[in-house]
Design a protein with these regions (language model features):
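Active-site beta3 strand of CheY-like receiver
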Residues: 45-51
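Helix N-cap/capping motif at the beta->alpha junctions
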Residues: 31-40, 61
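Active-site residues of response regulator receiver
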Residues: 7, 53
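A short, hydrophobic beta-strand element within the central beta-sheet of small alpha/beta folds
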Residues: 66, 71-80
Length: 80
């Protein structure tokens, strides 16, 4: 399963990726730092699942989802 990690906090992305390492069925195909970056990477990488922060500078995770034509499975990962 291809996964994309989306969070504006570098430490949060790094820690989540570390926690997912034991799950060999999950392949981290990329990271995004905001909604615009995520939109481009979702189109380019076509992940099966995204780990998505809600509160980010600019657009929120919810606003990102509204913009997508094809929405992958979503797991919200937020400290909100």
């Amino acid at each position: 399963m291809k996964a994309l990690v989306i969070d504006d906090e570098r430490l949060a992305r790094t820690e989540l990726i570390r926690l997912l390492e034991p799950f060999k069925e999950i392949e981290i195909v990329g990271e995004a730092v905001n909604a615009d970056d995520a939109h481009d990477k979702i189109s380019e990488l076509n992940p099966d699942v995204i780990f998505l922060d809600i509160q980010m500078p600019g657009k929120t995770g919810f606003e990102l989802l509204e913009e997508l034509d094809n929405v992958p499975k979503v797991i919200f990962t937020t400290a909100y």
